A protein has these predicted regions:
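Membrane-embedded beta-strand positions in outer-membrane beta-barrel channels/transporters
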Residues: 75, 141-145, 189, 234, ...
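Terminal intrinsically disordered/low-complexity segments used for targeting and assembly
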Residues: 2-80, 127, 140, 164, ...
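Short, low-complexity intrinsically disordered segments enriched in A/P/G/S/L with frequent Arg
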Residues: 3, 12, 487-498, 507-511, ...
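Short flexible linkers and secondary-structure junctions
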Residues: 25-184, 325, 329, 361-371, ...
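Periplasmic alpha-helical coiled-coil/stalk elements that build and connect Gram-negative outer-membrane
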Residues: 25, 156, 165, 172-289, ...
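A short glycine-centered flexible hinge/capping loop motif at secondary-structure junctions
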Residues: 220-224, 431-435, 472-476
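Sec/SRP-type N-terminal targeting helices
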Residues: 86-87, 103, 150-178, 228, ...
Length: 521
């Protein structure tokens, strides 16, 4: 047999033996079990279907619907100065940097090294006698080392894609933090406004009580009243003053809360003036399709990217079962003896190049455990994503039901205040004419006070319901894109799913670098 053929057969035998041995470590029986929901699998209720008429998304700066310039400025400052958003932004930068580290592993790695040193060569059992025995010479070298992962099984590529997907998760989480901050500021601002409205009611009640006391005193002085009536008129005054003081405290605390939410000190909050909130046309929805309702929510987007990242993790773990082949080489100069720079001459040139192969054979089950962990991580991400979808659609329905209820309650509350006001006016006229005692006036006044408080609470709840609904929808669209077309959504093209490059064994779409998992996942 020719020598060259024999050599090739030996090489082939080595490869066959290697692959046979590697079969001792297999991926059999390990696969993810989770299956992600499609949003359209979730049925919508009557509240969502009713709201889907004359559809228009809120604008990106949705809080401007309240028509309060002070609120607009405060939210803009909060987005710039909030420590919580600064942390979220730092996490985004950190994740992007980690993605850069992972992507670098796909590139050629080149390192330079140089050593200049004096070397004493002894005569002993290691060196032995020779030309360099008992001499001191230069022992120098300089060169470039090169390595490149051929990535035959996609390990490095999938690790890089996974890091990019995790970076996108951090972006979506940062958007979620921003949306929650905006919602918290709006809700705190609404409570700030409510305290002012409640104070107006209490202050008006105090003026009424003082007028009644003055009238009771005049009736007593005129001989048609009693000391008991005067005492009755005086009794509620201290409590009303206490309520005024409590509301002043609540207003001051609201200022502090708004300042803290914006990342500012109490001194900045002290400059806040009374809110002027007025909500216009109710918010409509783009359609009754859950995929469109949920597509903007940052937590849903983050969940999808997390599923994509875990799918990449499975591919990374699976690639570990196959041989790893790197191309390595070096080019440089080296010399022992001669002058200090003699090693830089052409005749001292040295180089090497070739593949470096590593193959797992026996590892005590480590690789199978890693694959099992990745598959379980995928199942966890899918389950979390499914729960996020269910919770998100429930939240939208809850806020729509709440908003509709608040609109109805607002009408009833206004009617109750009007009726209580008429009752109080009649009681006051009767008391002034001596046709009734003070107790009827007090009861009528208490009823009016209660109904006015309820009316303001309902109005505050209606304003809060709007903010909560916008938050449940994931915020608004950019100005000028106030349509039902979600292709203009702020996450579209950078975070929302488009299409899939491949479908791994886990059953979920593995997206391309610039894409997220398919809505089918």
């Amino acid at each position: 047999m020719p020598r060259c053929i024999s050599r090739e057969l030996k090489t082939l035998s080595v490869w066959v033996l290697t692959l046979t041995i590697s079969g001792c470590i297999g991926t059999g029986g390990i696969a993810p079990q989770g299956e992600a929901l499609s949003p359209n699998q979730l049925a919508t209720d009557e509240a969502i279907r009713e709201a889907a008429r004359d559809a228009h998304w809120p604008s990106r700066q949705w809080w401007k619907a309240y028509g309060d310039p002070q609120l607009d400025r405060w939210i803009e400052q909060a987005v710039q100065d909030s420590p919580s958003l600064a942390m979220a932004a730092a996490r985004v930068r950190q994740a992007r940097a980690m993605a850069g580290v992972a992507e670098a592993a796909e590139s050629v790695q080149i390192n330079g090294e140089a050593t200049l040193k004096r070397h004493n060569w002894p005569t002993d059992q290691f060196y032995g006698p020779g030309e360099l025995a008992n001499t001191t010479t230069w022992d120098n070298n300089a060169g470039l080392g090169l390595s490149y992962a051929l990535d035959l099984w996609g390990r490095e590529r999938n690790a890089s894609e996974q890091a990019v997907d995790l970076a996108r998760v951090s972006v979506a989480e940062a958007r979620q933090a921003q949306l929650e901050l905006q919602n918290n500021i709006v809700r705190a601002y609404i409570q700030f406004s409510l305290h002012y409205a409640q104070r107006d009611i209490v202050a008006a009640t105090l003026r009424q009580q003082e007028q009644i006391l003055e009238l009771a005193q005049k009736r007593l002085d005129g001989g048609i009243g009693t000391h008991f009536e005067v005492s009755q008129a005086q009794a509620p005054l201290p409590e009303t003053h206490r309520q005024l003081d409590a509301l002043d405290e609540a207003i001051a605390l609201s200022r502090n809360q708004l300042a803290a939410l914006a990342g500012k000190g109490p001194g900045d909050g002290a400059g806040l003036q009374r809110p002027t909130l007025a909500l216009g046309t109710p918010l409509k929805l783009p359609s009754a399709l859950p995929a469109e309702l949920l597509g903007q929510r940052p937590d849903v987007v983050a969940g999808r990217w997390q599923v994509a990242a875990q799918a990449r993790g499975i591919d990374v773990a699976r690639a570990g079962f196959y041989p790893n082949v790197d191309l390595v080489g070096s080019l440089g100069y080296m010399a022992t003896g001669g002058g200090a720079l003699e090693f830089l001459t052409g005749k001292k040139l040295t180089y090497n190049v070739g593949p470096a192969i590593s193959l797992p054979i026996f590892d005590g089950g480590r690789l199978r455990s890693q694959l099992g962990e990745a598959a379980a991580g995928y199942d966890i991400a899918v389950a979390h994503y499914n729960q996020t979808l269910v919770t998100a659609l429930k939240s939208i329905s809850d806020q729509l039901i709440r908003r509709e209820s608040m609109d109805k309650q607002q009408v009833f509350a206004a009617e109750s205040v009007a009726a209580a006001q008429r009752t109080y006016d009649i009681a006051m006229v009767a008391f002034q004419r001596g046709l009734t005692d003070y107790l009827n006036v007090l009861n009528a006044q208490s009823l009016l006070f209660k109904q006015q408080q309820v009316q303001q609470q309902v109005e505050a709840a209606r304003l809060s319901a709007h903010a909560d609904l916008v938050t449940a929808l994931g915020g608004g669209l950019e100005a000028g894109n106030d349509t039902a077309d979600l292709s203009h959504a702020p996450w579209r093209g950078s975070l929302l799913p488009l299409d899939c490059a491949a479908v791994p064994s886990g059953g979920c779409c593995a997206p391309k670098r610039e894409q997220a998992p398919s809505p089918r996942c």
